[in-house]
Amino acid sequence: MVDHSRRQLGLAALSLPLLAATPHLRAQTGPIRIGSTLGLTGPLSGASAAQKIASDIFMEGLNKRGGLLGRPVEWIVRDDQSKPDVARTLYEQLITVDKVDLLMGPYATGSILSAMGVAQRYNKVLIHNTFGLPGLAKYDGQFSVSGSAFDIESVWPSLVMDAAASAARPPKTIAVLASKFPSVHFVTQGARQVIKSRGLSEAIYLEWDFGNRDFGAIAARVKDAKPDMVWVGGVGLEANMLLDAMRKIGYTPPMTFAMFPAPGPMAKSPDGQGVMALTVFEEHAPFTNNPVAAEFIKVYGERASKAGMAETSVDLFASVAFASWQVLEAAVTGTKGLDDKALGAWIKRSQVDTIIGRMRWDGMNNFIKGKDLYKVKQVNNGKWQVVWPPEFAAPGARVLGG
């Protein structure tokens, strides 16, 4: 009896280490949890919706491929209501309450800056894709996958003015208009300097508060200035509302550039023909030569149509979201782990091929050094197509207007 009891105690003792290890084993085989926010409601909901569809598609494909490190991946996304202060609170909760393993950045400059502060406090890597104030990205653990250079205030306006100069009638006078939305306002101030440095004339400069919906007075003043080209440093539907106000007074600019318009509404607008904008990806060669991109385009179109999206084509916002996940997957695979310090070091020294091109972080504040991945696209017969630089232009496409 005594021997039997001792044998049972011995077996129990042997089992204790196994029982103690069970939670750890479960943690190592359970899902990897990645947390982020998007502005699913509020003024930035359109672009955020595109990013959510793109992210959902990537997640499904990733888990079909076996996930990360042989474990399934769970994406926890919260609605930050397009408000930076809400994003800050939610990222804090994702780390401290949800106990996520990794972070992914939100949409838009303000929310990214808020998330960046939280990530720095907890030493978490933050990959993001729509941060328009590179000089404020001081945290070394943040990495931009927007495809942009550090000095976008000169690189982007130079790209746009190169495109405009290739038109049949290059502009000599430019009306410069700017929303006070931080990133586009910042780039527009750089555009004013680029315009001046090229010996061109600024016909008029006007700005408005983000959220403004009455563009009648601005439209009238632009019409009176008679510029060869209008630069619209705006986001979302601002350019649509401005062009609509111009049409109502019988005015159409000879050439228009709108920095980041809502792509679907602009392409389908009666005022959209010939409008130029920035992009890193459009649904034509050479972008579609990438088989991963081609499959993404197919699935995205189906999902966007089902969701009732105004634009069902893969564009800038959807493509950079997908590319961001490609970078995170590459980093986890490359380091064979989830340690944020190791992930950051790997990203910093590496280059990653994505659907928008080869990403690198050799510039200031972990942006691209020198020429970046941005192109100029233009609406032609209701469709966006890249027109500049020529090597990325759609077959037969050239800059219209002027």
Regions of interest found by a model, annotated:
Residues 35-55, 78-84, 107-108, 177-186, ...:
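Extracytoplasmic "Venus flytrap"
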Residues 302-318, 327-386, 402:
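Segments of small-molecule ligand-sensing domains
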Residues 246-322, 387-395, 400:
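Extracellular/periplasmic periplasmic-binding protein-like sensory domains
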Residues 1-20:
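N-terminal secretory signal peptides and thylakoid transit peptides that target proteins
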Residues 100-205, 254-277:
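Extracytoplasmic ligand/sensor domains, especially the bilobed periplasmic-binding protein
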Residues 33, 46-53, 66-137, 208-215, ...:
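Beta-alpha junction/loop-to-helix N-cap segments that form part of ligand/metal-binding clefts
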Residues 109-120, 220, 227-249, 321:
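Hydrophobic alpha-helical
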Residues 21-38:
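C-terminal segment of N-terminal export signals and the immediately downstream linker at the start
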